[in-house]
Structure formats: structure tokens, C-alpha cells
Amino acid sequence: MASVAAWLPFARAAAIGWVPIATHPLPPPPMPKDRRKTDDEKLLINVSGRRFETWRNTLEKYPDTLLGSNEREFFYDEDCKEYFFDRDPDIFRHILNYYRTGKLHYPKHECLTSYDEELAFFGIMPDVIGDCCYEDYRDRKRENAERLMDDKLSENGDQNLQQLTNMRQKMWRAFENPHTSTSALVFYYVTGFFIAVSVMANVVETVPCGHRPGRAGTLPCGERYKIVFFCLDTACVMIFTAEYLLRLFAAPDRCKFVRSVMSIIDVVAIMPYYIGLGITDNDDVSGAFVTLRVFRVFRIFKFSRHSQGLRILGYTLKSCASELGFLVFSLAMAIIIFATVMFYAEKNVNGTNFTSIPAAFWYTIVTMTTLGYGDMVPETIAGKIVGGVCSLSGVLVIALPVPVIVSNFSRIYHQNQRADKRKAQRKARLARIRIAKASSGAAFVSKKKAAEARWAAQESGIELDDNYRDEDIFELQHHHLLRCLEKTTDREFVELEIPFNGQPKRPGSPSPMASPAHSTNSAAGLLQSCCGRCCSQRYQACGKYMPAASNAQNSQNNQPMDGTYLVEASF
């Protein structure tokens, strides 16, 4: 039978014309070269209820990890004959594939922190992540680190806000976060207003305001209304000087503050005014002062403290320093090459503007930036060809780093948006917690307050109606639960109140005022006479909630008692 079983596949192959019919059974199959060793065995790994099977030699490829070393024996379950790990089974699937294929992949849908924790638990370094996933992993890692840093700084800022005891610390926080207090917000808007006034005055003073008396040419407004513009400039400089001195006083590290970019801008913006006060009317010195007044335009950079978009743009340019350096280097190299070629292509033309290679720089820059002023135009065919190639090269060179800059700007912008959103959510959450605490506290004490008010009204002889009781939130919940109980049990429950005189009263009837002398037995008798056996059973179950426990206690304390009981109505 075994020979027939061995012959049948061979005969089937011969029937379709593959090989001729053989008279002998098939030989034994050859031993595969990659057949596993006899000491290899199949291992069963249970990860949070999900079982994985693999070979021992597969795990021992990486002996420096947890699964590849003898440390895995600490997780071996003798009863189930398996290794048990209380970890994430979805991430473990990628870890096991790393042992099988030698390539570690990063799943984009998984949490980065959980993924790193699983790798650290199994002793796998994140550096072995494959090239196909490493860029995504690195970007997610950077974004997560920035997000955690923002949260940490925000938490530290909130904690430091409670610990601010020094005036310098309070002033510095007011300068950096003007929305923390009203005074800081007012100073923030005042400085912004004077920055705008200073910039506008610097522009308007150059506008012509008439002709010079006895001279040719126009007279600018800065000279015609010199006193007005001087007063405006003085007021603005005084505000800027006070702001700079206050920031310098409140800075945690004054040396670091002085070396910062914004500090240098503040100094450059106010120094021309003070230098101008000490300059005489000498023409040479006045000419130098006019040149120095150009630095007043740097006051516009002070708006970066008042504009989040400008700060994001600055952070973007700072993060794209390498890409911008590549752009400048590429443009400089292309300008030199095309200017040299253009000079030799146009130097033999009479009256040409390309008199030298530096003179051709202007044409190359204008052409590569696609401006094309037309003041310098090539006349030879070779020069026109070079100009066309120069224009196309400029488009390509400038367009290459633009996507990187845009992506960085978008990343930083969304990061700031997420930070602002988290701050708003944190404030809203704290506000909800405060409201919940206040509401819950008011709800808990409302019962006590209502009871005290009821006692005071009864002692003064005022009859209470149901509207007064309905104002209590617990009474409303009580009646709501009664209605739900009636719907579910198809029974009607009546609330009977035992007033001071011992007479049962339904909720709709007025509450009579009488002496507090009554007993628990009389109340029980009234309930039994009113509702019979059901009331008796209900009274025995609910008697422990009555205000007084016995006649002896009532007579001893001589305190008024009342109570409300639920009975099943039998009509």
C-alpha cells in the first residue's frame, strides 16, 4: 500500500506529460539545507491572552534582548507550558517580527510612548528601526518631546505663579505673559500703541509738506513740524527706555538678557535719539546722525513681542537655518557661474552693459529671481540662451527649499495652536471642577439649611406649603424616584407626614401646628389604622428612620419630632 501511495503522484505527473512512467517508487526526498537542528523547539508565548508561536533559534538570534536571553525563563508558566507577558499584544506582534526578519517597524497608529516602553521592556534599542519607518518615528519623537516640554513648562509656570514672592519674578512674568494680570495687559497695549506711533512718525516725517522758502525743492514734514515730531519721538523713546530698564531689572539672568536679539533691537531702536541729543550742528556730524537715524526702523521688530505670527516666523527661520544656508550657497554659486558666462558672451558687443563679471551679477540676480527689470539685456544669441537657462535655474534653485520651510512653519504653527488649546482646556477643566465643587457643596448643605429653615418657621408658627419644600434639590430627587418606582411596580405610593400632634397628613393638606408631645407608638397606630397590614410592614422596615427611637428618649429630650413615611396606597 505504501508503494502504491508513493507511485500515484509520479503516475499522475506522467499522465499529463511531465515525466515518463517509472517502474520504481520515488526515492526519499533530499534533506533541506536549512533544516532546523534537533535541539530547536517550538515555544509558546502568551501576551495578555493572545498566544504567539515561534522557534527557540529565532529568539536566540539576538541574545542581548529579553526573549533571546535566559531571562525569559523568569516568565515561564510551568502549568500552561508557556511564557506569559502582561504586555501589549498589538505591539508585541512587531517585536516578534523583528526576531523573524531582523527588521523592526514602527506602527503609526500606536502611541509613541507605549511603543518605547514595550521596546525598553524587551531590551530592544529604537536605533534598529528600519529605514522605512525611522523618519516617521523620529518626527513623532520630536513632536512628542516638544509637547511634553510645553506641558512641563506650563505646569512649572503655574506652580511658580503660586510661589512668586519676589517683585522681580512678578514683573518678569508680567512682561513675558501679559494676560496674567490687568496691569500687565494695560502696559502691553500701551507699549504696542507707542511702537505703532513711532513707526508711523518715522514714515510721515519724510512726506513733502511744501516748498522750501527761497530754495528749490520740497520741505519734508519732519523739518517743517520739527517740534511736533521731536515731542513724539521723545515720548516714544521714554516709554521704550522705561520698558528696557524694567526688563533688565526683572530679568532672571541679566547677562543672557543683554545678549539676546530682542535686547539688542531695543538698544538699537533708542540709541539714535540719545546720540542726536549730544550732536552739534556741524554738517559732517549731522550727516552721520542722519545715517544713524536709519536704525530707528528697527523699532518695527518690537512688534514681534505683540504678534504670535511674527514669533512663529522667527522660529521657522531659525529651524530652517540649514535649508536657508543651502539656498544662499546655491544662489551664490549659480550667480557666479552665469555672470561669468554672460560676460564672455556679451563682452564683444559695442556699448554693452556687461563690462565686467561683477557688473553682470546684477543681471544674474534679477534674472534668477524672475524679476526682469530690463535695464540690462543680452544682445547676442549665446547671451540670450544663457539668460534663459539662468532664469530656469533660478526657479528650480529657489523652489527646492520652499517645501521644507513651509512644512516647518506649519509644524510650529500647529504646535503653538495645540499648546494654546491645551491651556484653554486646562482652564476650562479647572473652572468646571470649581463649579462642580461649589455645586456639590451647596447640594450637600442644602438639606441641612432647608431643615433648619423649616424648624425655624415651625417654631415661629408659620405654616409651610409644598412650594417651600420643592425648592430643596433632594426633595425633587426624592419625588422623582417615587414616580419612577410607581411606573416600574404599577403601585401608588403616598407620602404621609406625622406632624407634632400625631395626626397623619397627606402632602396636599396643610400642616397643623401643635405641641410636640406624641410618641412613636401613636404614630405606628395611626399608620396601621390608615393603611392596615401594608403600612405595618412598611413601618417596621422604616421605623429606624424616625426622628426619635423610643418614648423614653422623647420624654427625656422633650424635643419636637416630625417624620415622613412612604406607604402603599390601598383605595
Swiss-Prot record:
Keywords: Cell projection, Glycoprotein, Ion channel, Ion transport, Membrane, Potassium, Potassium channel, Potassium transport, Transmembrane, Transmembrane helix, Transport, Voltage-gated channel. One of its GO terms (biological process) is protein homooligomerization. It holds the Pfam family Shal-type. Glycans are attached at N46, N350, N353, N408. It is found in: Membrane; Cell projection, Dendrite; Perikaryon. Co-expressed with SIDL in the nervous system. The chain crosses the membrane at residues 186-204, 229-250, 261-282, 290-308, 324-345, 385-406. The N-terminus may be important in determining the rate of inactivation of the channel while the tail may play a role in modulation of channel activity and/or targeting of the channel to specific subcellular compartments. Belongs to the potassium channel family. D (Shal) (TC 1.A.1.2) subfamily. Shal sub-subfamily. Mediates the voltage-dependent potassium ion permeability of excitable membranes. Assuming opened or closed conformations in response to the voltage difference across the membrane, the protein forms a potassium-selective channel through which potassium ions may pass in accordance with their electrochemical gradient. May play a role in the nervous system and in the regulation of beating frequency in pacemaker cells. This is Potassium voltage-gated channel protein Shal. It comes from Drosophila melanogaster (Fruit fly). The gene is Shal.
